[in-house]
Amino acid sequence: MGLGVISFDPLLYLLIAFSIIIAISILLFFLHVDHVFIWTFSLLSCMYIGGSAWESLIITIISGTGPLYLFLIWWVTYGIAAISFLVIDRVAQRRISKQIKWDRSIALGILILGLILLMGVMEDFGCFLIWGLEHFNPSEVTWHTWIGNTIPIFYLTAIPGGILTCIGLVLGRKFGKRNESLSEAK
């Protein structure tokens, strides 16, 4: 049984609606944000929507599944990913002073890189959970089947992503405490 015959689960509609409502709520809550925040969110959203459209097109060519169906499923996972980065950006703006120190921005970059690596794995794994592994076989969606069924690939991406995320968090806390103690000394 291929992806083209899977029925659209009503739970997916709820996930899509929930993802969009949360995104709009967060944007309304932070209406006073500065232009850097707006540009960051816009850029990330465009990246994720572009990625979802590209993957939808690729899988449509391979499996013959309608692009709208796949686009909506990808919007769920990528919409949640964009919300995650939105929250990370807000937390970073609140915790880091307006004069961002160079070492602190490196820590934030490492944190975001680790989260990007983890998000790719979680997004693919989430698709397997939604669709069910029984719908995948070697003749359909070869790339996704290979990623989902090859455990070493999961560890090669998830472990470095987790390590980079932890390093980013530790460095961020370390540099944050050092900057706070320097500002108190002045």
Residue locations for each model-derived region?
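Aromatic-rich, lipid-facing transmembrane alpha helices and their immediate juxtamembrane interface loops
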Residues: 1-184
